[in-house]
A protein has these predicted regions:
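Proteins that catalyze or organize thiol-disulfide redox chemistry
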Residues: 1-53, 60-127
């Protein structure tokens, strides 16, 4: 793992998430060929986008996190912004697709997303 990525564990997950901003998590395992193929792409993006937190979760060591995210195939990329999970992508993304994904995340109107989350929470309390 390069200096530009964070190794996520159950112990540091909440603190990492609370930092806010964009968080990209690569769920991987050492035995996974596609994971090993995606690793240099993920590391290169981490070096290029220093304002984003890039993190990796070894699904063999962190089975609790993998279960919490219902990881069924690896690699899987989980995307957060300002502490809100925006989605997951299963499979190794090519560099251009990862760059496109990062731009899409940057372009999201988070005030609108936060309003939608608050409305759903309010609606859930009424049920």
């Amino acid at each position: 793992m390069g200096a530009t990525t964070v190794e996520l564990t159950e112990a540091n997950f909440e603190d990492t998430l609370k930092k806010g901003g964009i968080l990209l998590i690569d769920f991987w395992a050492a035995w996974c060929g596609p994971c090993r193929a995606f690793a240099p792409t993920f590391e290169a993006a981490a070096g290029k986008h220093t304002d984003i937190t890039f993190a990796k979760v070894d699904t063999e060591k962190e089975k609790g996190l993998a279960a919490a995210f219902e990881i069924r195939s690896i690699p899987t990329l989980a995307v957060f912004r300002d502490g809100i999970m925006l989605g997951q992508n299963a499979g190794a993304l090519p560099a251009d697709a990862l760059e496109k994904k990062i731009q899409q995340i940057r372009d999201i109107d988070m005030e609108k997303v936060k309003d939608e989350v608050a409305a759903r929470a309010k609606q859930a309390k009424q049920v």
